């Protein structure tokens, strides 16, 4: 099978390869696709990155059903002008299609990764190159396994190459759900072993930007450890195990900070600025291009229909995404992070006040992603920022507080984040209110608020609330919210196909 387009319909590492080459399409790993050379392996690994993007809308993009909206759509920082009430109001079922797309897209992606890894093992190429590319695929596979776990709980994954490479075995493979112990150990082991052979971000060639790095593997270890700490405390009632995981958070964040690979940007909004792409705060980026299926479409989802660019950029505006005023109003008026949420905008004639003059659903416009001159229709070239260094800093502060209480180091880490949010921070009341906290519970409660202000509309809110045991009590106060809603339902179509697979409790 041949193609004259090495993008594989979704490849974002365009600069790495010539679009004039004719290569095998390794995003379809059938028996006819044989890899024999280093270039074959490189193309095949690049092809597996397609699974991050899907069709350009869901998965690690921003449309409904993406990881982003799955992680905020049932929380207090999110609202929408469109009819997505099943998620917004905790009314989802196993038949809610949008909330099952991540599952039905990424579980097969894990199988593809397993197939590719086995084929790569059998190829005779340079050992360091082989280890590096296999590490990339293992990191991707572990990342997908973690995000599926966070959303749906443990799910059956094909990690056995004998099954993955045999269509008949794969078709008849109907396992029960794996244990939490097996699943967590699988993710942790894959990430640790991948990390050993991944490049630091600073050593990537410009054409390699967007590939898996040592920092991304560490970031997902951090996410896994924080997830397990929260689960053990609030849902498994094992404080001893929770503390074990907090110690792992302590260790991995210490390593990441001492490595010096990443640093905070001085200006908060510059993190997402089109003129500051590939900056040192971004750990996990997805590069974009102003083309269908390859671009960033966040602004199209967020901008009101009558919004007019003051930069003369032709923008698509669907007016969906919102930040409820109740959440917006938790920001201090002098907190510069609030500037990422538009309360007023230009409609070509005047500034519109969304509180008093907007007739749609009430709320501010999330606009961390900014107007980009490189825009075609709804697609622009701003990279997606999936994870960034500020998460590491606040995660370390949280771990230190859980282990030792609100130490000075923990407070100093919070100061690092707040110093760029407030002018003249040193000696201000904003610095003092952190220094005055002496109680572990009070510091924990503040960290949850701080993360809300720092990461609004970045996909952190749902896991943060769950880790603190507060999703159901805080998130929107919806009447239909129940304890079962800390997980989404496995799609009913998957349950029909595998009679041994039991859905999450309550679905």
Residue ranges and their predicted role:
Residues 38, 42, 46, 50-51, ...:
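Conserved, well-structured interaction surfaces
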Residues 88, 326-389:
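Flexible, polar/acidic helix-loop-strand segments at domain edges
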Residues 149-150, 156, 227-236, 402-405:
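Short coil/turn linking the two alpha-helices of tandem helical-hairpin repeats
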């Amino acid at each position: 099978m041949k193609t004259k387009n090495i993008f594989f319909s979704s490849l974002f590492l365009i600069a790495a390869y010539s679009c004039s080459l004719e290569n095998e399409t390794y995003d379809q790993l059938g028996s006819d696709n044989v890899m024999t050379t280093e270039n074959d392996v490189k193309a095949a690994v690049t092809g597996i990155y397609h699974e991050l993007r899907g069709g350009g809308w869901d998965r690690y993009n921003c449309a409904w059903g993406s990881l982003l909206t799955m992680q905020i759509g049932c929380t207090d920082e999110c609202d929408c002008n469109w009819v997505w009430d099943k998620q917004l109001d905790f009314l989802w079922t196993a038949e809610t299609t949008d909330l099952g797309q991540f599952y039905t897209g990424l579980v097969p992606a894990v199988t593809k990764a397993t197939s590719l890894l086995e084929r790569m093992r059998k190829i005779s190429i340079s050992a360091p190159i082989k280890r590096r590319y296999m590490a990339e695929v293992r990191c991707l596979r572990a990342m997908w396994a973690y995000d599926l776990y966070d959303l749906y709980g443990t799910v059956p994954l094909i990690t056995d190459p004998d099954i993955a490479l045999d269509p008949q075995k794969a078709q008849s493979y109907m396992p029960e759900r794996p244990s939490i112990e097996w699943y967590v150990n699988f993710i942790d082991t894959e990430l640790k072993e991948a990390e050993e052979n991944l490049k630091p971000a600073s050593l990537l060639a410009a054409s390699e930007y967007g590939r898996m790095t040592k920092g991304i593997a560490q970031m997902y270890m951090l996410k896994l450890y924080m997830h397990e700490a929260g689960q053990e405390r609030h849902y498994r009632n094992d404080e001893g195990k929770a503390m074990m995981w907090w110690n792992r958070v302590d260790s991995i964040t210490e390593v990441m900070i001492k490595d010096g690979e990443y640093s905070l940007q001085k200006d908060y909004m510059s993190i997402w600025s089109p003129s500051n792409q590939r900056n040192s705060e971004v750990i996990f980026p997805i590069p974009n291009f102003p083309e269908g299926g390859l671009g960033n479409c966040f602004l199209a989802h967020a901008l009101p229909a009558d919004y007019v660019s003051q930069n003369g950029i032709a923008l698509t505006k669907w007016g969906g995404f919102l930040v409820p005023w109740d959440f917006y109003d938790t920001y201090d008026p002098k907190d510069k992070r609030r500037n990422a949420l538009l309360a007023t905008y230009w409609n070509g004639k005047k500034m519109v006040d969304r509180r008093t003059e907007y007739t749609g659903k009430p709320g501010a416009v999330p606009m961390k992603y900014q107007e980009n001159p490189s825009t075609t229709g709804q697609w622009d070239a701003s990279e997606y920022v999936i994870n960034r260094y500020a998460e590491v800093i606040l995660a370390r502060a949280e771990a230190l507080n859980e282990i030792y209480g609100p130490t000075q180091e923990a407070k100093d880490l919070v100061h690092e984040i707040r110093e760029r949010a407030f002018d003249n921070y040193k000696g201000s009341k904003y610095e003092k209110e952190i220094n005055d906290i002496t109680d572990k519970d009070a510091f924990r409660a503040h960290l949850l608020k701080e993360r809300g202000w720092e990461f609004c509309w970045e996909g952190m809110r749902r896991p943060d609330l769950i880790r603190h045991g507060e999703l159901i009590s805080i998130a929107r106060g919806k009447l239909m919210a129940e304890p079962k809603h800390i997980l989404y339902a496995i799609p009913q179509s998957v349950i029909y196909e595998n009679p041994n697979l039991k859905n999450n409790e309550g679905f």
